[in-house]
Amino acid sequence: YKRQMHAGFELAECRFIHDNKFPPLDAILSDGAGSGTLVYGPAIQGWKDKDIADNEVTLFCNGVFKRKGNALTAMEHPLIPVTWLANELSRTGIGLKRGQLISTGTLTGMLIPKKGETYTADFGIFGRVSGTYK
């Protein structure tokens, strides 16, 4: 099967109530408690021949700049977390399955989207991806 790469981002959703007992961000991220909807674009053609490690991404909300990040944020190269995951799942006998999507981690930090907001991530030569939180 083909190994594809897509530019994308996640619209965070959190199962915790936002009050004075709200856990720290590191706990939310490590627990997967901020997982939400994955928004991704078409497969990137020729991605193996491009420098994906030093790619920048700019995040906008409703057309307004929010944050900028770099692919080096994902454990210094976006393929390192993918390799770790594949090895760990193989070691435990689970393995990766055809068609599964893997997100390598945030490059711009976590924002909590509000209903009706449209987020756009500009990945430069890898394209733009947009999603509206409903």
List each language-model region with its residue ranges.
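Catalytic-core "active-site belt" of small-molecule-metabolizing enzymes
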Residues: K2-H77, T118, F126-K134
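Buried hydrophobic packing segments
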Residues: Y40, V82-L89
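A short beta-strand-loop-beta hairpin characteristic of the jelly-roll/cupin
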Residues: G63, N87-T92
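Active-site scaffold segments
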Residues: L79-T83, S103-G105
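Beta-rich strand-turn-strand
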Residues: S90-Q100, T104
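Short, charged beta-turn/beta-strand-edge "cap" motif at the junction between a beta-strand
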Residues: L107-L111, I125-R128
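Short glycine/threonine-rich loop-to-helix capping motif typified by GTGT followed
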Residues: M110-T120
